[in-house]
């Protein structure tokens, strides 16, 4: 089941997160491969949290309200992905990051991108929207 919630965070809190992540002082890091390392695509990432190392960003606290609202019982990873505008859509392979848990995708900007699921459902990128689904 795919659950979509628009206007997920209070406007002021969302704008604060958006401003931080789109600002000059926010660090992004190159990652080879969007889905798999050899897929010939790339993206920029910011890792907020990984269980192996714990909080991995000085900005981890911006996600407190978000985690409470999604009622997360355990966090496996908080990661921001930044992809770039391309002349044509660059589809990636379907994949599962984890099994037996839920994934939440939170959209920071509105653009012509989307998240596509194996059943054909497409979720448009709309700022302050969250898409929650079973990871497997």
Residue ranges of each PLM-predicted region?
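Conserved metal-binding segment of the jelly-roll/cupin
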Residues: 123-136
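Short catalytic/ligand-binding loop motif for oxyanion handling, primarily in non-cytosolic enzymes
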Residues: 12-15, 37-39, 86-92, 114
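Short loop segments at secondary-structure junctions
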Residues: 8, 108-112, 136
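A short beta-strand-loop-beta hairpin characteristic of the jelly-roll/cupin
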Residues: 88-91, 99-101, 107-126
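Internal catalytic-core helix/loop-beta-alpha segment
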Residues: 74-99
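A broad, low-specificity signal marking well-ordered, structured residues that form hydrophobic/aromatic
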Residues: 2-3, 73, 78, 102, ...
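Non-heme Fe(II)/2-oxoglutarate
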Residues: 1-74
